[in-house]
Amino acid sequence: MRVENCIEVDYHVLTDYRQDLSARNATLDMRFVEATEKDEALRTKRRWFTSLAWDRADKRLYCGQTHRAGQLLHAFDPSTGAFEDLGFDEVAEDNDMKIHRGLWLDEDERALYFGLATLSSVPALIEAPGGRLMRYDIDARRFDTIGIPLPGNYIQATSYDPVRRMMYAFFEPTKSFAAWSLEEGRLVRAHFVDSIVHVSDVDDDGGVWGTATGRHVFFRYDPSDDAMTLPEGCVLPTARQASGILYGGAGPVDCLINGGDGFMYVTTGLGELYRLDPASCELDYIGRPLPWLRAPAIRVGRDGYLYGVGGDNGMTFLWRCDRTSESFEVLGRVAAEDGTACFRPHDMVLAGGTAYVAETDSPGRSGYLWECRGAVGEKPRTA
């Protein structure tokens, strides 16, 4: 695939940790937790970017990360290129190792909401308290624990509903789902669902979507009547083929967002894009913008187009979709002029005309924050 880059790409380094990946040391990348227990430099310096949230008011980017020593949250200032450690390590517990997916900014409250994930083995989690739902007060610079929905389980993804004051969590290792009322400060319900999404969102009527059973069918939870339904026939046609690609045991959904046009948009581990109608529960296949696996993040741009990032193993590309014509345009590869390339994208946010991409799982070095200028059009698309 030949692509002429329409974007200007740079990367930002928080901790420049590098590692010899000779055959003798290659296993350090494979056994991250075990290795960090023996290597202080690896424990404190090695990190990956996993979740992003853009603050329009302060023009700062909040960055959730994977970090063995608990430094999981930083603020990035694009005007200076500087990162600020927000001090999560002061409240971190033993198994708190990442903000995997779901870093939600409530602009009215000036607060961030997220859940805590782990890399610990199952034996290490037997006596563990479980992943916490967290709130960070930006102005007070304070972390508060909202609650622990499922003891012994850690939170791979969250969804946040500021209107109905709800948080939703998707868990490993049991592949469960939980609904938490922020208003009442309690767990509303929790279920083993035998599938897991990478990240999800809430539809216009307040329903949150996930996948369940070995077939990875969609479910919808509606907090207004505390109802959880599995609509008949609402399943991705490639659900089984797309499963297990994100990581072992993962479901097919790489990203699911509210498109702001009455529909939900779904990407899969195969890199496909679908439109989901919450009213009819029908799924329409739009296309596959790249010839590689993965599409971990999609966002709606200021011009009305749908923007995505996908690819893997150093072949990471930005693309956009005209939802009216269902056509795709590949904007360019996420790679800098010095030859450094984004190894594996994990999240993306749009800030004006710029796309920021979180990089994870990069072998031999820490992950970087990627800045792709000129990615997003300036004016709303006209019909």
Question: Which ranges hold each PLM region?
Answer:
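Residue-level signature of beta-propeller blades and closely related beta-rich strand-turn architectures
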Residues: 67, 117-119, 173, 214, ...
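Surface-exposed loop and turn segments in beta-propeller and other repeat-based domains
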Residues: 13-42, 87-95, 147-153, 230-248, ...
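Blade-level signature of beta-propeller repeat domains, shared across WD40, Kelch, NHL, RCC1
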Residues: 342-383
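Short loop/turn segments that connect beta-strands within beta-propeller blades
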Residues: 77-81, 137-141, 181-185, 222-226, ...
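Repeated scaffold domains used in trafficking and secretory/extracellular systems
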Residues: 46-53, 95-104, 152-160, 195-203, ...
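Conserved beta-propeller blade signature
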Residues: 60-63, 112-113, 166-169, 207-210, ...
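Beta-strand-rich domains and repeat architectures in extracellular enzymes and scaffolds
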Residues: 4, 34-68
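Short, conserved, GDST-rich strand-edge loop motifs in beta-rich repeat architectures
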Residues: 114-129, 361-363, 367-368
